[in-house]
């Protein structure tokens, strides 16, 4: 099977280094590539290791004012634009600076209603969630974890890059015909990130198209079920919420800001006012509650079917500490975020998206599976998990930095676990 990149090469295109080399998937309108210079991503191979020598060695052996709410990351305990939740144990409500509206241009949330079962999350709770404990934590399981930690610590950077190179050589197992159909081309954020036909998420009785993929990861007979999707476009917002409703998803993990480095990564697809729902043909979406922590935003939505009045609750969790380039400097915030998302998950596949729905989304899914595996005293293999992802959505985990970050996160979790008494 051909990847979107291979299709470009067949038509005489190069590797999307410049916007002028874009393929015209939309005939009169070109889509960007997920790897263009204007999109803030690092090149696959950085400066630490010479990529050509690694490759040789491998083959010898392989539109909103968002900055008003979330300015460039500043590590300050006195930043009044973010509600610091560390003292939340002394509060019994969410912030209520202005109960009229809450959205990307406001640092606002609302008092919890008496009937609400949602409670504000404290930093203490997040710290406890990050302390992953196996079901059985005795001398035998400790020894197994120590062996696992030692094996991971022995892996050098070169070994991890070789693994990533091997993943890059995978042949796509399926076609992308639906994504290339004329009526669907405007529904893709990037021309080189399309879902496989066999794993794409169908919409409605007609199985309409959305750029989203079912991801099922199997480890020791346990299955972990996700939807990996791109950040919604203005014209696909209704499709996105329809997908959430039809798949009974109760959690959305969003791992991007709407704008990063001056580039639009995802549109604001949620209602920003507590009084004005987002109206669609068959349903509307209401914002109920809102909380801003130091590193992610919690929004509680209700999707209400107009025909029946039946309501479906969704918790929207937006991670805001991923830098414009590369990966987070510290794994701590992301570990807490992933654990809170997992704790919040109840029904349907866990829906995850970034901008393209492959890079940060892949990192999230990989480490979430590893965390669940550790809890159940099972062994795990990061490369195997990523291989399974890539068989179901093209290009999951885009860069070697993201792949290395998976290892760094798991190492930190294991070290913290073994340090416990």
From Swiss-Prot:
Domain of life: Eukaryota
Key word ATP-binding present: no
Any single GO CC term annotated in Swiss-Prot or TrEMBL for this entry: nucleus
List of catalytic residues: 354
PROSITE patterns: TYR_PHOSPHATASE_1, TYR_PHOSPHATASE_2, TYR_PHOSPHATASE_PTP
Catalytic reactions on record: O-phospho-L-tyrosyl-[protein] + H2O = L-tyrosyl-[protein] + phosphate
Alphabetized Pfam families for the sequence: Y_phosphatase
InterPro entries cross-referenced by the UniProt entry: NonRcpt_TyrProt_Phosphatase (IPR052074), Prot-tyrosine_phosphatase-like (IPR029021), PTP_cat (IPR000242), Tyr_Pase_AS (IPR016130), Tyr_Pase_cat (IPR003595), Tyr_Pase_dom (IPR000387)
Annotated compartments: Nucleus; Cytoplasm; Cytoplasm, Cytoskeleton, Microtubule organizing center, Centrosome
GO MF term list: phosphoprotein phosphatase activity
Documented EC number(s): 3.1.3.48
Ranges in a coiled coil: none
Region (Disordered): 1-58, 93-116
Keyword Cytoplasm: yes
Location, primary (coarse class): nucleus
Keywords: Cytoplasm, Cytoskeleton, Hydrolase, Microtubule, Nucleus, Phosphoprotein, Protein phosphatase
UniProt domain Tyrosine-protein phosphatase: residue ranges: 160-413
Compositionally biased region (Polar residues): 48-58, 104-116
GO annotation terms (biological process): lymphangiogenesis
Sites where the protein binds substrate: 324, 354-360, 398
Family note: Belongs to the protein-tyrosine phosphatase family. Non-receptor class subfamily.
Full protein name: Tyrosine-protein phosphatase non-receptor type 20
Organism: Rattus norvegicus
Recorded name of the encoding gene: Ptpn20
